[in-house]
Amino acid sequence: QARVERVWSDEKGHYAVLSQTLFYPESGGQPADRGVLRGPFGEVQVLHAYEEEKAFGDVVHVLSAPIPEGVEVEGEIDWPRRFRHMQRHTAQHLLSQALLRAGGYHTVAVSLDSPVCTVDLEEEAEEAGVLEAEALANFAVYADYTVEAFYVSEEELARYPLRRPPKVRGKVRLVRIGDFDLAACGGTHLKTSAQAGPIKVLKWERYKGGTRVYFMAGWEALEDYHAKHALLARLALAFSTNPLELEKPIRKLQDELYALKGENQALREGLAEALLPRALEEKALLVPLPVLGELGKRLARFEGTFL
């Protein structure tokens, strides 16, 4: 519960600042919470939340309709959305630490605003290092480490072996995952590392002199697996094989297609050559559409001819 401290509207929407809030504002690569505010006015949707001033400003709630100033409200966060964000964020901490341990790869930026998340690394990562990191991150999931957040002063920071230096000054919020990872972070996290799994690396690529790693985690990784498994099952049924042997019939089909394309091209060229003398002699000639392009190329070599 909270009191509405300030409200305003403009051509883009309606806004409110509350005396206190549990709505997480978009920050640190993590999307904002959504949900509802309830009060004497009824119910309005919270569409977005952001900080007026980065790290220390009031949280501004973007609303679906205006509300009066000074009233008491009750907020409800869209919990399924929040939980998925927490899974992404805790999984990112685990994967970033695993990448550091497996290959000495340092995380410089993250994006958690879609089910497919990214971690940007300073170094060019090798396949063996990324795969080892994926396994290590999932071992950390199975270890069921406790996740805890606490604040320390700027002077106390030197006592803590942080994965990366903090970007803020003054009191700093740290997130510790057992004895596996410790990092400065203001985001929302799970209670234990086990809730973040599974963690699946999808791919990685060179990016700005380093590497961008794409991954999914938690329910979203499981949903992705279900979708891909269903697709493989349908394809396996169509090719009368099992999912793990699909590559062979697909490659065979590709080879047959390439061969047919070659034969088709040879037939078009042969027919175009056969029709060329008649096309040069006759004013009008009916030509099969697939051959028209090849015949046109040949006619273009002769002056005064056109299609």
Residue ranges and their predicted role:
Residues 81, 100-207:
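Functional cores that coordinate and move charged inorganic groups
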Residues 20-37, 68-119:
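Active/ligand-binding-proximal structured segments within catalytic/core domains
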Residues 63-65, 121-125, 215-217, 289:
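Short beta-strand-to-loop capping motifs
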Residues 10-12, 54-56, 67-69, 113, ...:
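Short flexible coil/turn linkers enriched for glycine and charged/polar residues
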Residues 5-22, 70-82, 167-182:
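Short, hydrophobic/aliphatic alpha-helical segments
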Residues 196, 202-307:
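Terminal appendage regions of diverse proteins
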Residues 1-71:
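Conserved nucleotide-binding/hydrolysis modules and their immediate coupling elements
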Residues 32-33, 41-49, 125-148, 298-299, ...:
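Polybasic, low-complexity association/targeting segments
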